[in-house]
Each structure stands twice: as C-alpha cells, then as structure tokens.
Amino acid sequence: LLNRIDEPATGRVLDPMFHADIPAGRLAQAKAAGSILGEQVWRQFPWIGCSHGEAGQAHAMPTTTDPVEGILARTWRPALSVTGAAGFPSIDSAGNVLRPKTTFKLSLRLPPTVDGELATQRLKALLEADPPYNARVSFNADWGATGWDAPETAPWLARAADDASRAAFGRPAAWMGEGGTIPFMNMLGARFPRAQFLTTGVLGPRSNAHGPNEFLHIDC
C-alpha cells in the first residue's frame, strides 16, 4: 500500500497531485542559499554512523548531497514519513503468527501551493482502492493543511532585509523556505492579500515549542 504513494528505493512521491511547479523566484533563492550553505544543508543533521568493522566511519546519507536539491526537497517537494505503528507485538512476545490488523500513522509533506484538503482526499482514495488479497483497508485523516507561499517581496522590505543583514553579517540577505505548515499565515494572507510579512520568533533554551530541540541559538 505504501508503494502506491512513493518509490521504496528513492522515496520519490509518485502521484502528480502531490507535486507543484517550483516558481522561478523560489528556485533562484534556493540556488543562492545553496551556494552560501554548501554541505551544511545536510551535514547539520545528526546522521547515525557505524563505530565498528571496516565501515567504522560510515554513516547514513541523505537522498541528495547537492545543497540546492536538498533545500528544494525540504520545501517544494512532497515526502512521505511513517511516524508511528501499532499492531506489532513486542520482540519478547513475538511469534510466528498472523496479526489481526496493522495500523500506521503517516505524514505527507506537501509543497506550499498544493491544496491540503484535496491532497488528503486523494491519499485516502489511493490507500483504500482495490485492497490487496481482499484485505480491509481504512484511512482516517487527522487533518490536512495547506502550506503558505509568501507573496513577492516588496522592494522596500527587500532593502530593509539587506540593510539589516549587511549591518549584522556584512552580506546581503539570503532567502530560504522552511518545510513546515503554519496555518495562521494562510489566514493572514487571505485576510490581508496586499500585506508584506516578516515572520520570525526567538525562542530561548528549553522553550521547545514543537519538539525537544526547537529553539534558535543566536551567537551574541
């Protein structure tokens, strides 16, 4: 069933409905950011490595080490994750028996211009249609949210960002999207279609709004 959603060898999501055309401006921003960050785009993550044998220095690798492709994969390409599972016995009680049912919790990241509700309906149809071996398959969605693609940056805001970046870092500002949904931004964008947005927040140590290590570390 999961192979209906993505390729098991590459992780590429198959259905065109989950994809979106990448705007030329966003592609240019990703190229500029990639040229600055280089391998930091993927080396910043704690890759698991082996500590024994001939492959003692080997570690897991991302699907791409190209900085630009890494940025686009996080922001403008869909990706499927299995975030939970139920119905499997623990190892100490597992036996050679059939399970009555198996449950997976899935997370499908979408490009910001893909409609979250329509994508949820499509995902349900893909998983429930023609079950293999006459199995019973059911899909229940928690929620499907549409991402947010910020409007084109006004010249005055771009100048302000460049001035601030030059004052702090000696270089003009660079732009890079982030692969996460903040539904409130869509609400604000719909309510104020001509507004410019500068969305930021500084969270101190251990604030951890959504995860165990979510805060900004700012060198002073």
Model regions: which residues?
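Hydrophobic residues positioned within well-ordered beta-strands of beta-sheet architectures
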Residues: F104-L106
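Short beta-strand/turn micro-motifs at beta-sheet edges
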Residues: I91-N96
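Acidic-enriched catalytic cores of C-N bond-cleaving enzymes acting on peptides and small amides
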Residues: L1-P89, V114-N134
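Active-site-adjacent substrate-binding region
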Residues: N3, A9-T10, E152-A195
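Short, glycine-/Ser/Thr-/acidic-enriched flexible segments
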Residues: G87-S90, R109-T113, G144-A145, T181, ...
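Zn-dependent metallopeptidase/amidohydrolase metal-coordination segment
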Residues: W76, L98-T102, R171-C220
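Generic structural signal for residues in well-ordered beta-strands
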Residues: V82, R136-A141, A173-W175
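A short beta-alpha structural unit
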Residues: L108-P112, S138-A154
